[in-house]
Amino acid sequence: MVNVRQPRDVAQILLSVLFLAIMIVACLWIVQPFILGFAWAGTVVIATWPVLLRLQKIMFGRRSLAVLVMTLLLVMVFIIPIALLVNSIVDGSGPLIKAISSGDMTLPDLAWLNTIPVIGAKLYAGWHNLLDMGGTAIMAKVRPYIGTTTTWFVGQAAHIGRFMVHCALMLLFSALLYWRGEQVAQGIRHFATRLAGVRGDAAVLLAAQAIRAVALGVVVTALVQAVLGGIGLAVSGVPYATLLTVLMILSCLVQLGPLPVLIPAIIWLYWTGDTTWGTVLLVWSGVVGTLDNVIRPMLIRMGADLPLILILSGVIGGLIAFGMIGLFIGPVLLAVSWRLFAAWVEEVPPPTDQPEEILEELGEIEKPNK
């Protein structure tokens, strides 16, 4: 019998693999500037896809109008706040650095301490004793560090330009994905099925659920609390309310809540003697700080029940790895990986035997081998 099987050509196989590797690396190199923007757009589109479908029904089934409205909403949510933040930094950094470097910053008198019952007079006297013992010297020692820190933060504002480019790419890709979302989703599911069969398709669907869960459970809650807290800061007359609102968003994303920003603002209002607005902001901060306990259970019932350590690690790690965009992409990547890992583990039933029985069986197996 003649063997018609062709011998393996090792050189051909190696060259084919090398060619494919070069093509993949070249393609990734070309699309590298767009990867973060596209990933961000994909996250936004998956999370807001139900909203697009509802808008399309309201607008008599016209996808173009729904896409236009969603794009305008994204501009209001992302572009306008960033523009306000940049404007606030530019307007406020100059006078702040000038006051620090020139030595014009002095410690306040804190006359409102006298209004505190029982202990107010002692606090006021103690504060003035501190000033008499070297309050100016304290400011002289602290001032260089304050100036260096402020200059560093202002220097980081240069990264806003790159972030704005990613925002523009996100808007462009989001509009395209809104327009052809069904075709893109079908293509991704087809590719996943080609890779891993039914498991690949299930992995894509689980990933979409995880993305929507992160958007609901983390981002929505953070935005609601931060916006309400920012409104309270603006109404109370706290300076740099826009910048503090952005800091509140970061604080809420890492699951610390808005209070780490609101409490110093309250202290500042009492410090400057504006006790009325300080009390108003104190009450409002209590409402905003506990709002998480109302929103979170509602979102958990909608499928946003994710481990706290997962969200915290995703936000911090994403911020370090990808910058400001990582605040949104980091938790999504970890949540998708977590859901896929959990689904893979659940394919096998959990052990039902007692640990003692397993150890006894293991000991009986090892005895004959001795």
UniProtKB/Swiss-Prot annotation:
InterPro entries: AI-2E-like. Its main location: membrane. It comes from the Bacteria. Keywords: Cell inner membrane, Cell membrane, Membrane, Transmembrane, Transmembrane helix, Transport. It is a multi-pass membrane protein. It is found in: Cell inner membrane. It holds the Pfam family AI-2E_transport. Signal peptide: none annotated. Residues 1-17, 61-65, 128-156, 235-248, 296-308 are periplasmic. The chain crosses the membrane at residues 18-38, 40-60, 66-86, 107-127, 157-177, 214-234, 249-269, 275-295, 309-329. Residues 39, 87-106, 178-213, 270-274, 330-370 are cytoplasmic. GO terms for cellular component: plasma membrane. Belongs to the autoinducer-2 exporter (AI-2E) (TC 2.A.86) family. This is Putative transport protein YdiK.
